[in-house]
Each structure stands twice: as C-alpha cells, then as structure tokens.
Amino acid sequence: MNNPRGAFVQGAEAYGRFLEVFIDGHWWVVGDALENIGKTTKRLGANAYPHLYGGSSGLKGSSPKYSGYATPSKEVKSRFEK
C-alpha cells in the first residue's frame, strides 16, 4: 500500500482542487465581464457626452477647426414666405 491515506482525505483533496479551479475560473470570467462593461460604459458616455470627457466633438478624429455648427453658404429663404 503506497498511500495510507483514506478515501475521505483523497476525496476532500479532489473536491478542493475542483473548487479552486471552479472559483478561480469564475473570478476570471466575472473580472473580464466587469472590465468590458466598464470600458463600454465609458465609451458610450464619451460618445453621448463628449464635453464631460474632454472632447469637443462626439466623433473621434474630428478637427477642432471644423467642429461646431454648420453655417449656410447661401441665403436661407422660408418656404412659406410670400
């Protein structure tokens, strides 16, 4: 008999190894999910409220020179004016 330990001890060790892997795996998955949720929330917030995140425009790569409101290039006439 090479291993004098009983079945209960071996079962407890096996269960402990299983539980360790199970809990470690779940922490990994939950941690990744929370990280991705945080990044997505930040990105959506920056797109919706660019002034809160230090940007002047909601579109990435937009030039400060051309951002802002559009200006008409010709005279604007009302459709219902007589």
Curated annotation (Swiss-Prot):
One of its GO terms (biological process) is photosynthesis. Its main location: other. Residues 59-69 have a biased composition (Low complexity). GO terms for cellular component: chlorosome envelope. It is found in: Chlorosome, Chlorosome envelope. One of its GO terms (molecular function) is metal ion binding. A bacteriochlorophyll c binds at residue 26. The keyword Coiled coil does not apply. Residues 55-82 are annotated as: Disordered. The keyword Metal-binding applies. Keywords: Bacteriochlorophyll, Chlorophyll, Chlorosome, Chromophore, Electron transport, Magnesium, Metal-binding, Photosynthesis, Transport. Pfam families: Bac_chlorC. Component of the photosynthetic apparatus. The light harvesting B740 complex binds bacteriochlorophyll c. Belongs to the BChl C/E-binding protein family. This is Chlorosome protein E. The lineage of its organism: Bacteria, Pseudomonadati, Chlorobiota, Chlorobiia, Chlorobiales.
